[in-house]
């Protein structure tokens, strides 16, 4: 039509069509495609790309790359949910759970009929007499036919009991004399006792014996009477004459019985010469000058230890002095320690004993006692033992102390902040069968006495003391008849004025608690083994209809259990 009119045609322009987008839509579409496929970081192939940000939906958002937590941290959060809210990790590790541990089980021969009989006492052979303070005589005996704790082993009496089939019939027991006394087994050789286990002497150099009761928490008191020692009479050199020497104090399981109490870092002692306190073989003045300890004096010893729950917090590195109190009586705590006793019955002459690997000295405390000038270990560091020390063996127990009385008069508090004794502060001797980190229930501070060349002493674990300490009041409504000093007479009983762990009690009460604990632990072990056997009793010796079932153990095939041989 334009050509017919003779007018020139207008410049060509693209026209819109339904199938072809407008010129402005083409670059927009391409821009959208470029945004979809443009990398977020420019590369050398397209350095000038500038993507236009646009809103993205939840599905289009790229996944955030978070650092993966370690397995140890995830397990820690699973066990302790409170850590998930921490801004920074807890620098103090958690106390490991010991609930998975059970006592080791051994293959044993069947018990003999004599094993079901009560434990036999030691044999007493008369040795000599010692003049008593009242003008009489004290008969001393040499004990025999019993085992001695040595070579890193600890022995306790046991008996076969048909009520404990899953434990292969053996459980703990006590031999005469019953009650708290100086232990015949836990003593050095060449010591002489009376038949009650309360008097002790020797004709050799320093020897030590521990009592048969361990103090683990609370306040306890006991007494030592010097029956043979330093006298007031002067010799030719102006020094007091001596019939021998006596030391007394508290000792842990690791303390050597072939040395006096206070010899190493595992015991705290007092010597009769000058009334000095002794720790790590370093005597220091304590009693007033010229005071000393003489024949006839009664030395009272009081010890206080915090609750076991607080002690475990100290050993786990979780102790906070601003929150944790040393006299926590544990009344609201429902958790109890898992006592694991790895022990095997052995025969010694006519006796049956449980043999256990005893706790052994540690390098850290030996370095503390004898620091090396060239050593860079913890003993030479500027950090003294304290509850939060980096080395568990050098951690101390808050609010712990030892007080000393002389003839009923408080002389002072020579020792505070006693070293911790629960694992991992105490470790067994490294050998086959020893497992670290376990508490066998025998750790603690034991009353201990050392004698030297004729020195003699008598112990009194209560409840009827020669000089009752403050805090004990006479209870007129509770009189009992007891034998004291060889005479039968009504004996006074004492009630204690303070509640909780700060109540002072005689060591004799702790002995009763220890017996109850041993019975409970025996029952727990029996139930534990019974559950391991599928909640049924298995005849391991092939004597019954279930002899074909052996569970986790098989009959040993031996005719006799292990026989122990020791030199007398």
UniProtKB/Swiss-Prot annotation:
Sample GO molecular function, one term: transcription cis-regulatory region binding
Record keywords, A-Z: Chromosome, Nucleus, Telomere
Span of domain B30.2/SPRY: 160-353
PROSITE patterns: B302_SPRY (PS50188)
Gene Ontology biological process terms, A to Z: negative regulation of gene expression, epigenetic
One term under GO cellular component: Set1C/COMPASS complex
Disrupted gene: phenotype observed: Impairs tri- and dimethylation of H3K4. Impairs mycelial growth, sporulation and spore germination. Impairs fungal virulence but not infection-related morphogenesis. Leads to increased production of several secondary metabolites, including colletochlorins, higginsianins and sclerosporide.
Subcellular compartments: Nucleus; Chromosome, Telomere
Region (Disordered): 1-113
InterPro entries, per the entry: ASH2, B30.2/SPRY, B30.2/SPRY_sf, ConA-like_dom_sf, SPRY_dom
Compositionally biased residues, Basic and acidic residues: 68-77, 89-98
Quaternary assembly: Component of the COMPASS complex.
Functional note: Component of the COMPASS (Set1C) complex that specifically mono-, di- and trimethylates histone H3 to form H3K4me1/2/3, which subsequently plays a role in telomere length maintenance and transcription elongation regulation. Controls the production of several secondary metabolites, including colletochlorins, higginsianins and sclerosporide. Plays a key role in mycelial growth, sporulation, spore germination and virulence.
Family: Belongs to the cclA family.
Protein's recorded name: COMPASS component cclA
Gene from which the chain derives: cclA
